[in-house]
């Protein structure tokens, strides 16, 4: 679709939902090499860049439509995962990326995701789980990823009182597809 403006689309959607001029704190989490920094860079600059692994937490101010987000890219290597808990206070949403083309690491991703689900402080925080790299020939299907991560019964677009909002979105950051739906979904909870 030539000339399609992703950011204009976000602005229009958020305006229609009454989410103009809101502010939220988002954490970008997931294992190393899942695409967290690439996604953040794409959202901020609308282009790809050659990136190195994230060794230290980085913070960016990001506006999608009229919602301003303070985003934290915390890195996914083992040492960085120990710091994730330091960023939980006052978080409004978590974007958890999984490399859908690396099934050998699904169990590790599930362990980290399940550990996050057990943290009382995050009980009401929405989780947008992104199965990234669907452009890769080795990427698994959404059904396979849901099963591997234990996400067969997510909340979808239904707000259920007393239940944490969780949804899985399949995407390709490099192809600029799939992740906009995740941010639209997250915006309904901020």
Curated annotation (Swiss-Prot):
Keywords (A to Z) from UniProt: Cytoplasmic vesicle, Endoplasmic reticulum, ER-Golgi transport, Golgi apparatus, GTP-binding, Hydrolase, Membrane, Nucleotide-binding, Protein transport, Transport
GO biological process, one term: intracellular protein transport
Membrane topology: Peripheral membrane protein
Enzyme class, broadest EC rank: hydrolase
Catalytic activity: GTP + H2O = GDP + phosphate + H(+)
Subcellular location: Cytoplasmic vesicle, COPII-coated vesicle membrane; Endoplasmic reticulum membrane; Golgi apparatus membrane
Domain of life: Eukaryota
A Pfam short name: Arf
EC number: 3.6.5.-
Keyword check for Cytoplasm: no
GO cellular component terms, semicolon-separated: endoplasmic reticulum membrane; ER to Golgi transport vesicle membrane; Golgi membrane
InterPro entries: P-loop_NTPase, Small_GTP-bd, Small_GTPase_ARF/SAR, Small_GTPase_SAR1
Residues binding GTP, per UniProt: 30-37, 73-76, 132-135
Gene Ontology terms, MF aspect: GTP binding; GTPase activity
Functional note: Small GTPase component of the coat protein complex II (COPII) which promotes the formation of transport vesicles from the endoplasmic reticulum (ER). The coat has two main functions, the physical deformation of the endoplasmic reticulum membrane into vesicles and the selection of cargo molecules. SAR1 controls the coat assembly in a stepwise manner. Activated SAR1-GTP binds to membranes first and recruits the SEC23/24 complex. These SEC23/24-SAR1 prebudding intermediates are then collected by the SEC13/31 complex as subunits polymerize to form coated transport vesicles.
Annotated NCBIfam families: small_GTP
Entry's family note: Belongs to the small GTPase superfamily. SAR1 family.
UniProt subunit comment: COPII is composed of at least 5 proteins: the SEC23/24 complex, the SEC13/31 complex and SAR1.
Name of the protein described by the UniProt record: Small COPII coat GTPase SAR1
């Amino acid at each position: 679709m030539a000339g399609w403006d992703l950011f204009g689309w976000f602005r229009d959607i958020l305006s229609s939902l009454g989410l103009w001029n809101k502010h939220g704190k988002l954490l970008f989490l997931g294992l190393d090499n899942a695409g967290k920094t690439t996604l953040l860079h794409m959202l901020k600059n609308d282009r790809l860049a050659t990136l190195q692994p994230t060794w230290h937490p980085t913070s960016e101010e990001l506006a999608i439509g009229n919602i301003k987000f303070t985003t934290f890219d915390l890195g996914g290597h083992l040492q960085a995962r120990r710091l994730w808990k330091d960023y939980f206070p006052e978080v409004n949403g978590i974007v958890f990326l999984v490399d859908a083309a690396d099934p050998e690491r699904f169990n590790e991703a599930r362990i980290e995701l399940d550990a996050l689900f057990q943290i009382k402080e995050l009980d009401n925080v929405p989780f947008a789980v992104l199965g990234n790299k669907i452009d890769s020939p080795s990427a698994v299907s959404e059904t396979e990823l849901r099963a591997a991560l234990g996400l067969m019964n997510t909340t979808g677009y239904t707000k259920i009182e007393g239940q944490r909002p969780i949804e899985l979105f399949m995407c390709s950051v490099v192809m600029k597809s799939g992740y906009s739906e995740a941010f639209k979904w997250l915006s309904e909870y901020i």
